[in-house]
Amino acid sequence: RFKLLKYLAYLSFISIIVQVWHDYFGLGSTFVNIPGNDGWAMSLYFFNTEWGENRLASIFWEPGQYQIVLIFVMGLFYKEMLDPFTLKPYLKHLLILTIALIMTISTSGYIAFGILISGAIVNSAYGRKHIYLLPLLSFLAFSIFLLLWNSDAVQKKIAQGEVNEENSFNIRMADNLALLTMVGNKPVFGYGAGTKSAEDAKNKFGSISQSNGWLRSAAENGTPYVLYILVLIYSSIKRRVHIASAALFLLFAFILSQSGEGNTYFPYTYMYVFKYCTQQT
């Protein structure tokens, strides 16, 4: 896990430099056509630098996917976050990931990060030892969440709901309602992943981009499938942190992190589904 953190920190550090270079110091970009997609404007051949206004996407197809990677890798060190004395060897790498997350300007990422940090504060070794300080720690955690909630990025997304046009907020709301309808129609087995009946149902109920991975999985594979995956993730987290409430905080952060993306990005989710011989490599 430390190798993964280290390499992601290196990638994020370079990505931040390239993005700042592009946004403020004139680094150019080349439009790359991709079959079946609209293509991307890439800087230095690898970095997706023009997704939205000054938003960091790194080498990923959009900032929303990048924040999922950042949140899930941060979660590998949640146990250390609960005891700051063990966090020092990883602190500089996690700080780079935090800066990168802020630069994604992702609403889902901000809220997920707020929940992750809130859980770390409330369930920290210091907080559990000094239980009388729990109200103060809870207030501090809520203040962090409120600060992120009132950020320009989040408030702009919320304000979009009042505009009668195709934008991120309205598209995702339409997707959620359509996918929820599909889940309600076939809650146990779903419509099948990638089947014609699933695609027909998405079109019928008004899903534009299938932007909620959890609901999409439930609509295609059935609710029991998604619940089973979430139980496995929770069990894995609890084995690592040994605190049920802390595990719930991190699980909730993971759910929200992926609630605005069309896939559940299992290469990262698998880190919390399967058991590994060691967490160190």
Residue ranges and their predicted role:
Residues 73, 247-256, 262-281:
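Transmembrane alpha-helices of multi-pass inner-membrane enzymes
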